[in-house]
Amino acid sequence: MAAAMAEQEGSKGSARNRGGVQRVEGKLRASVEKGDYYEAHQMYRTLFFRYMSQSKHIEARELMYSGALLFFSHSQQNSAADLSMLVLESLEKHEVKVTEELLENLAKLFSLMDPNSPERVAFVSRALKWSSGGSGKFGHQKLHQFLAITLWKEQNYYESRYHFLHSSDGEGCANMLVEYSSTRGYRSEVDMFVAQAVLQFLCLKNKTSASVVFTTYTQKHPSIERGPPFVQPLLNFIWFLLLAVEGGKLTVFTVLCEQYQPSLKRDPMYNEYLDRIGQLFFGLPPKQSSSYGGLLGNLLNSLMGSGEDDDVEDGQEDSSPIELD
């Protein structure tokens, strides 16, 4: 009986709090609609810190989120970006569990920010760090997918590609690469767009996405004749490589790399990626010294990460940032 009464009182208190927040939101919205942007912005900040000090983290976060959307709708980029950062602050300090709804909200804020603003860079960095849940991995795959799609819509293919590589959306990545290659690439390099993506997915131990991106890209690209086999030797190599990875036979992998050296020499990074793939899927030992030092070595290390734990689910290992060359 007592427990039921306490629960009922708690529900009433929660309803009162929500009603109070809605009234405050109404007043703030009216200020923004009148064009009192500065005053409204300062009031949002004051309420945020008040709610946070009272441990009303959810109310604080929801108020900042709705406020940011409101400022974005009135083209007040600076105020909107500031409130977006406060949304992140509430998530960081409250140690909130990562949910798809929260990731969608963060992606929504990201999509509304000025693509060229430094605030957007800072926002996405913090959002990815929070979404990793303290695991040390570089962001939640779903958030990377949302970001990749937004950047693709903005025709920022370079950055979109980076985030697709850290997602599990091989099909989306392939469709983006088809558009990227068709609008920005040379016809003679249609095979290289997908080859690099497949090799990098494999270096991240994401066999599933590597296979999906290859199949989807080769089926949908208007300049690629239906295969296999393909007209382009590099595409045949990638096709055989994916089969070899599934089979796990070192001799097949070794012969394959030897036979296709002319195609692999088109990009100096291919053999570096294949060295790592040999370690991950065929039991080859790491090379004592890389044939590429300096910048290329650093690019490869950042792609592959330093993790050596092979008992990891597909696509979940080596989630450190990928430098795209």
From Swiss-Prot:
Q: Where is the composition biased (Acidic residues)?
A: 307-317
Q: Which InterPro entries match?
A: GET4, TPR-like_helical_dom_sf
- Report whether Magnesium shows up as a keyword of the record: no
Region Disordered: start and end of each range?
Answer: 1-22, 306-325
Determine the domain of life of the protein's source.
Answer: Eukaryota
Q: Name one GO biological process term.
A: protein insertion into ER membrane
Q: Give its localization.
A: Cytoplasm, Cytosol
> What are its GO cellular component terms?
BAT3 complex; cytosol
| Xref: Pfam families | GET4
Question: Which keywords are on file for this protein?
Answer: Cytoplasm, Transport
Record family assignment = Belongs to the GET4 family.
- Role according to the record: As part of a cytosolic protein quality control complex, the bag6/bat3 complex, maintains misfolded and hydrophobic patches-containing proteins in a soluble state and participates in their proper delivery to the endoplasmic reticulum or alternatively can promote their sorting to the proteasome where they undergo degradation. The bag6/bat3 complex is involved in the post-translational delivery of tail-anchored/type II transmembrane proteins to the endoplasmic reticulum membrane.
Family annotation (PANTHER family): GOLGI TO ER TRAFFIC PROTEIN 4 HOMOLOG
Report quaternary structure and partners: Component of the bag6/bat3 complex.
* Protein name according to UniProt: Golgi to ER traffic protein 4 homolog A
Protein's organism:
Xenopus laevis
Task: Give the organism's phylogenetic lineage.
Answer: Eukaryota, Metazoa, Chordata, Craniata, Vertebrata
